[in-house]
């Protein structure tokens, strides 16, 4: 695979029709080559065809925040944008939170999502998530749904682009969460949901 002028992907395939019949913005060239527009939808379709196309986030996103991302953080953010459901098994201390924030910010910029719910342990709602959102996406509105039930509900029903809530808090206001307009959910330390017999998992 070759990136052409930062706009298109040049593929060499045994069966070019395999791609050109499902991607309108593609063109068959000579010698089993296919030129595909490098957009989010095209990259996702290529991924579904087992062609490892890079995420357009690597081309067009202005990495926000106080710190420049490492290459592995860019790769992780790209992975998140290419997969509607994903798990991240990167080692502790590798900047997974920042990668998730950048991916969410990119999807917000593209209009693919409108609102993000972050579910995490109570102990890191402020110290990690709120602080990291202010560090890496200071232009986004953030609120923490914590405290009395009515207070949590009011925050969820508000207009913050990122809402942070702890695991048990989801159960307290589950109806508000379901109606909150969240189209991206980030679960930090998802192992807390590993047992399907628990209320938390359900």
Mark where each language-model region is:
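Charged, low-complexity intrinsically disordered regions
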Residues: 1-53, 110
